[in-house]
Every structure is written in structure tokens, then in C-alpha cells.
């Protein structure tokens, strides 16, 4: 299973996309810190901020586990409120990375010696 890992650099405001076949990411949760060596960024430390599964359902930090659930939402990730007081039931993925996750969003917490550099790869 291949993961697309998007690394966001808060200093420059740019994002970089990498692909990895690593199974070291399975079982990690939103908020966990991982080594940048998973995506060939030696010396970097990355924090998992979210992701989505193969069907496009977003991960949510307050749903524990790796399963997909239909939850009633009034705000937050996975739902944009159109009117005040409006609630809606949405399908979302839990906060744990499993084999069904295809996209993982991360941000840089600790920088390595080499610059991130290069242009972000386009998603096709």
C-alpha cells in the first residue's frame, strides 16, 4: 500500500508531496510525531495533522480507531456549517492510520540540515 504524504512547511507556506510504501505509519494517530526519514527527509520531525481514505473521507481527531463512522456534526473538520445551529450526519474516518488511508497530511516540527527545496509535485 502506498501512502501520499503531504509535508507542509509553515516557514515558507509551501507544501511538498512524497510517496512512501512504509508500513511504519500504520497504527500512528493524528497528533503523533514521526521521523522524516519515512519520506526521505533525514533529520526532520513531522507531526501528523490529518488525512483521507481511498474513498475521500476525511480523518477526524476525536473519532478513536481506524474505522469509518457516520457522526452528527455541528462544526469542525469534515463539515462546513452554512447556518447557525445546523447539524448534519457525515461519514468520517477515525484518527488512526490503517491500510485504507491513502493521503496523510503532516507539518514540520523540527527541521533537518538539508532544505526541503524543489517544487511541490502536482497531484494527478
UniProtKB/Swiss-Prot annotation:
Superkingdom, taxonomy of origin: Archaea
GO MF annotation, one: structural constituent of ribosome
Gene Ontology terms: biological process: translation
Name of a matching Pfam family: Ribosomal_S6e
InterPro entries xrefs: Ribosomal_eS6 (IPR001377), Ribosomal_eS6_arc (IPR020924)
Assigned GO CC terms: ribonucleoprotein complex; ribosome
Keywords: Ribonucleoprotein, Ribosomal protein
Protein family (similarity comment): Belongs to the eukaryotic ribosomal protein eS6 family.
Protein name according to UniProt: Small ribosomal subunit protein eS6
Organism taxonomic ancestry: Archaea, Methanobacteriati, Methanobacteriota, Methanomada group, Methanococci
Amino acid at each position: 500500500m502506498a501512502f501520499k504524504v503531504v509535508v507542509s512547511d509553515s516557514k515558507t507556506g509551501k507544501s511538498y508531496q512524497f510517496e512512501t510504501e512504509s508500513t511504519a505509519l500504520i497504527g500512528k494517530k493524528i497528533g503523533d510525531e514521526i521521523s522524516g526519514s519515512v519520506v526521505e527527509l533525514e533529520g526532520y520531525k513531522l507531526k501528523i495533522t490529518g488525512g483521507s481514505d481511498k474513498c475521500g473521507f476525511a480523518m477526524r481527531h476525536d473519532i478513536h480507531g481506524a474505522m469509518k463512522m457516520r457522526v452528527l456534526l455541528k462544526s469542525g473538520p469534515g463539515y462546513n456549517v452554512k447556518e447557525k445551529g445546523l447539524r448534519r450526519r457525515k461519514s468520517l474516518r477515525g484518527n488512526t492510520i490503517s491500510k485504507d488511508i491513502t493521503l496523510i497530511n503532516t507539518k514540520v516540527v523540527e527541521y533537518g540540515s538539508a532544505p526541503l527545496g524543489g517544487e511541490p509535485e502536482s497531484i494527478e
